């Protein structure tokens, strides 16, 4: 059986990267929430 997680740097960046988060209003909300919480890493 093939496992669910098949790592790929490209796909990782394209779906969870900083620039993608900045594109949408909700993505920016995610970043702001993480900033408010004091996360060391805002995005992948």
Swiss-Prot record:
Q: Which GO terms describe its biological process?
A: translation
PROSITE patterns linked: RIBOSOMAL_L34
* Full protein name: Large ribosomal subunit protein bL34
Q: Does the keyword Translocase apply?
A: no
Q: Which family does it belong to?
A: Belongs to the bacterial ribosomal protein bL34 family.
Q: Mind listing the UniProt keywords for this protein, alphabetically?
A: Ribonucleoprotein, Ribosomal protein
Give a GO molecular function annotation for the protein. Answer: structural constituent of ribosome
User: What PANTHER family does the entry give?
Assistant: LARGE RIBOSOMAL SUBUNIT PROTEIN BL34M (PTHR14503:SF4), MITOCHONDRIAL RIBOSOMAL PROTEIN 34 FAMILY MEMBER (PTHR14503)
Source organism, top-level taxon: Bacteria
One Gene Ontology cellular component annotation? ribonucleoprotein complex
